Curated annotation (Swiss-Prot):
GO cellular component, one term: cytoplasm
Reaction(s) this enzyme catalyzes, per UniProt: a (3R)-hydroxyacyl-[ACP] + UDP-N-acetyl-alpha-D-glucosamine = a UDP-3-O-[(3R)-3-hydroxyacyl]-N-acetyl-alpha-D-glucosamine + holo-[ACP]
Principal location class: cytoplasm
Entry protein name: Acyl-[acyl-carrier-protein]--UDP-N-acetylglucosamine O-acyltransferase
Family per record: Belongs to the transferase hexapeptide repeat family. LpxA subfamily.
Domain of life: Bacteria
EC class (word): transferase
Organism for this UniProt entry: Neisseria meningitidis serogroup C (strain 053442)
Subunit structure: Homotrimer.
């Protein structure tokens, strides 16, 4: 059985595993690498220095590896790296990195990215995330593991969303969202704990209670932020579910949602 449709345009220099399926009228550039059992639908465009792993499914009209929407970009050989087992739906756009950033845009494994989502230059997306339709990341955004972005969520440049966090429909994320927390609103504010997401991912009632107490410490006890942060970091030394807050606080550049 022929796995590449005869109307697809694939540069001879592109490296595709023999098991890759390519649909009609798809265009693949010379610096593209695609791993085993990845399936690409019709009318997709994959360009730039782009590496795609195994067992991905890329739907029609996706645009992956085009140049960043950054006026400073001067055709440097920056990269887009996509892991394994991702579902990338219709009309998604993933841009290359920039030399003023980390030089690459990275997407991990087992992510579910719905139609019309946009990942700008130098974004880093973890594993097992869900992006609902039209969620968009500006440049230099970091998304942790098991994050859920509601439809039409917009994330500002350099923001960070921690593991297991969730945003509501049309949230405008302008500051960092701590792990496990929910955010909602045009200028996103804290909206409680993603306790259902935690339960679905195997957290115990005791662990959820510990994280809930962190939420109360940050937002409901009237404690200055630095004092609350120090208290949470102390608890993280003995409570494994709080360990993610160490890296999150250390790497947070924009401050957290309040």
């Amino acid at each position: 059985m022929t796995l590449i449709h005869p109307t697809a345009v694939i540069d001879p220099k592109a490296e595709l595993d023999s098991s890759v399926k390519v649909g009609a009228y798809t265009v693949i550039g010379p610096n593209v690498q695609i791993g085993a059992n990845t399936e690409i639908g019709p009318h997709a465009v994959i360009n730039g220095h782009t590496s795609i792993g195994e067992n991905n499914r890329i739907f029609q009209f996706a645009s992956l590896g085009e140049i960043p929407q950054d006026k400073k970009y001067r055709d440097e050989p920056t990269r887009l790296i996509i892991g394994n087992g991702n579902t990338i739906r219709e009309f998604t756009t993933f841009n290359l990195g920039t030399v003023t950033g980390i030089g690459e845009t990275r997407i991990g494994d087992d992510n579910w990215i719905m139609a019309y989502c946009h990942l700008a230059h130098d974004c880093v997306v973890g594993n097992h995330t869900i992006f609902a339709n039209n969620a968009s990341l500006a440049g230099h955004v970091t998304i942790g593991d098991y994050v859920v972005l509601g439809g039409y969520t917009l994330v500002f440049q350099f923001c960070r969303i921690g593991d297991y966090a969730m945003t509501a429909f049309a949230a405008g994320v302008h500051k960092d969202v701590p792990p496990y927390f929910m955010a909602s609103g045009y200028r996103a504010e804290p909206a409680g704990l993603n306790s259902e997401g935690m339960r679905r991912n195997g957290f115990t009632a005791e662990q959820i209670s510990a994280v809930k107490d962190v939420y109360k410490t940050l937002y409901h006890r009237g404690i200055p932020f630095e004092e609350a942060k120090a208290d949470i970091l102390r608890r993280a030394e003995t409570q494994a579910e709080l360990a993610v807050f160490r890296d999150f606080f250390a790497q947070s550049a924009r401050g957290i949602i309040r």
